[in-house]
Amino acid sequence: MNAPFTYSSPTLSVEALKHSIAYKLMFTIGKDPVVANKHEWLNATLFAVRDRLVERWLRSNRAQLSQETRQVYYLSMEFLIGRTLSNAMLSLGIYEDVQGALEAMGLNLEELIDEENDPGLGNGGLGRLAACFLDSLATLGLPGRGYGIRYDYGMFKQNIVNGSQKESPDYWLEYGNPWEFKRHNTRYKVRFGGRIQQEGKKTRWIETEEILGVAYDQIIPGYDTDATNTLRLWSAQASSEINLGKFNQGDYFAAVEDKNHSENVSRVLYPDDSTYSGRELRLRQEYFLVSSTIQDILSRHYQLHKTYDNLADKIAIHLNDTHPVLSIPEMMRLLIDEHQFSWDDAFEVCCQVFSYTNHTLMSEALETWPVDMLGKILPRHLQIIFEINDYFLKTLQEQYPNDTDLLGRASIIDESNGRRVRMAWLAVVVSHKVNGVSELHSNLMVQSLFADFAKIFPGRFTNVTNGVTPRRWLAVANPSLSAVLDEHLGRNWRTDLSLLNELQQHCDFPMVNHAVHQAKLENKKRLAEYIAQQLNVVVNPKALFDVQIKRIHEYKRQLMNVLHVITRYNRIKADPDAKWVPRVNIFGGKAASAYYMAKHIIHLINDVAKVINNDPQIGDKLKVVFIPNYSVSLAQLIIPAADLSEQISLAGTEASGTSNMKFALNGALTIGTLDGANVEMLDHVGADNIFIFGNTAEEVEELRRQGYKPREYYEKDEELHQVLTQIGSGVFSPEDPGRYRDLVDSLINFGDHYQVLADYRSYVDCQDKVDELYELQEEWTAKAMLNIANMGYFSSDRTIKEYADHIWHIDPVRL
């Protein structure tokens, strides 16, 4: 790299890496190799690998600046990037070299990788999608950066105590984070509260409290390319360290109280929003992210172009869900109040730069903020939102003069529920493009949630089906299968997943079929070892591994899965000597800390597991396992070992899902409803290679319209009746027989909102077909191979190309 002085780049040989790791341990960490522990060796290795990425990173940044390319800025409250070391070594192609260097020093790379804390800066699919997107942006050489919050405490650590979920803090930074660069000089004032003062036409926001947003940068490496991008995370810092006056008077606690209050903003991911103060902190968090980010975007733009006139030509800002939608009024505020734009010009810029992804159609999950709360914390922004709404409703009135109901429905301010600001509405009114994340979801979006807006802005809505990065989800997570693919297809599938299609031609070759089967068995043995060590449950790797790992939520219907497990248990008890296909049912996922029913479901899974796993009549025929503290790194262990992937949400509720893609890519067959991306997976893999059951989205709606009566299913279906009676009468909770009465009531007597009972029989019958196929191992593996072969479409590289071409209009950087 050109520099005004000479220096020697770090080289990539085993010997050089060995020296580098030892050097980092001694001179950066300051530790004697004789007494250093695994964490210190891990950090030294991370520093050594990071050094080898820095030049690429600086070169990429320099190229983006010199070519004055249009950039995309991707805003998300969540980024679940997973462990960084294995991914970085894979991107650089130095996995074996680092392994060799560590071995020469008597260390085991796999053990060090397991020491790395998984940064829990997200809750589920939203954050993992954002991470896959950053990986693809870098691999494709597209100019972009992610912006999020550097939470001190990530998603809580989940412990299972007496069958129940208990949360403890997840301090992922306890051993430091060598992967990040703190940018002491990149800091912005973020303001809250205060009041607005009109001075003629000019508006001033005064008497505010201030905190600072300080930047921390992480390198996002592209695979096998010099292109790298940046994830910039903001940490909150008090604008003044302590109140010295109070300190000198001896009031030490009061002296630091303000500092602590300020820094709470980036302390924890998603504070409990069941209280007013929790909701207020959540709003402050969202504004903290957008204010720091929009100030940074404008500052970077001005440094490069010395004008704001070309803003709309040079930047695209993407809002991942509604959490960062306050970016819109913040951009308006900065352009009008600080950069002397007229209101109309500022609005025009916003309409050109913002785009928004909708991730849910469920009304309870759509963000709204009380007008009073917004007015108290962000008075200037509320004023701007009112102005945008007035402008929008005026133009609407001109277009539809006789439709007063439409004005009420389309207004950004919901007047019917205690005056609330609808964030999704604000995003749709201002963004130039709004996308859903699967064909089904995008269609439902314009037919239901945004039907009025689809009529008002017909060209605004589009679909971009989600994808996953093959680097992390196949190359890193599944070395056994990757080796088989490399041998028969070459290595280029890592950057062009459509090349997996060639695997179709190998489905009938016994040798390849056997190799794929063996790779699966190796992964199952690895998971079985983990389950034995961590949970003290012995499972048979030759049994069918039936897996459902995702957030615990009623719409994802883990409960229906449990009903099938109990049905299976009852059948085995009735005829223990029959030839049963042995199964291991594996669950994993966290329930939101204030979500009573989801926590109840976890308790039920563990109670059922306790009874089944300790029943001598059952033995290896059926095991039930709940793996606690689900994370990206656990997903990388579990997904490659799955035979059957459970994607059983009620049709019309899951926007897309991405674990469905990860499982199929790793050779699991899917059992699922026609929901989210399952619909497109069916199109790609063919109806013979996927297990589809249950009502369609139309049938679900029809059932609701007719008046769904769950009790009828309970009374008509003997097996279902038996299962629900067992749960309700305490068969699985003998020490507390009434524990699940309310849960059973919610299904039979209180509407069964997610229609578990309606789909139960179809689901159980479909599971019987799964058993039949699993007995024909070669045929099962051939179908698994067809799934792998047809996953090319579901690469996040394809997804990002679509965003780049149709929404962001950005081109790759020339390196």
Swiss-Prot record:
Belongs to the glycogen phosphorylase family. Phosphorylase is an important allosteric enzyme in carbohydrate metabolism. Enzymes from different sources differ in their regulatory mechanisms and in their natural substrates. However, all known phosphorylases share catalytic and structural properties. This is Glycogen phosphorylase. The gene is glgP. GO terms for biological process: glycogen catabolic process. The modification N6-(pyridoxal phosphate)lysine is found at residue 662. Its cofactor is pyridoxal 5'-phosphate. It comes from the Bacteria. It catalyses: [(1->4)-alpha-D-glucosyl](n) + phosphate = [(1->4)-alpha-D-glucosyl](n-1) + alpha-D-glucose 1-phosphate. GO terms for molecular function: glycogen phosphorylase activity; protein homodimerization activity; pyridoxal phosphate binding. InterPro entries: Glycg_phsphrylas (IPR011833), Glyco_trans_35 (IPR000811), Pyridoxal_P_attach_site (IPR035090). Keywords: Allosteric enzyme, Carbohydrate metabolism, Glycogen metabolism, Glycosyltransferase, Pyridoxal phosphate, Transferase. It holds the Pfam family Phosphorylase. GO terms for cellular component: cytoplasm. It comes from Escherichia coli (strain K12). Disulfide bonds: none annotated. The lineage of its organism: Bacteria, Pseudomonadati, Pseudomonadota, Gammaproteobacteria, Enterobacterales.
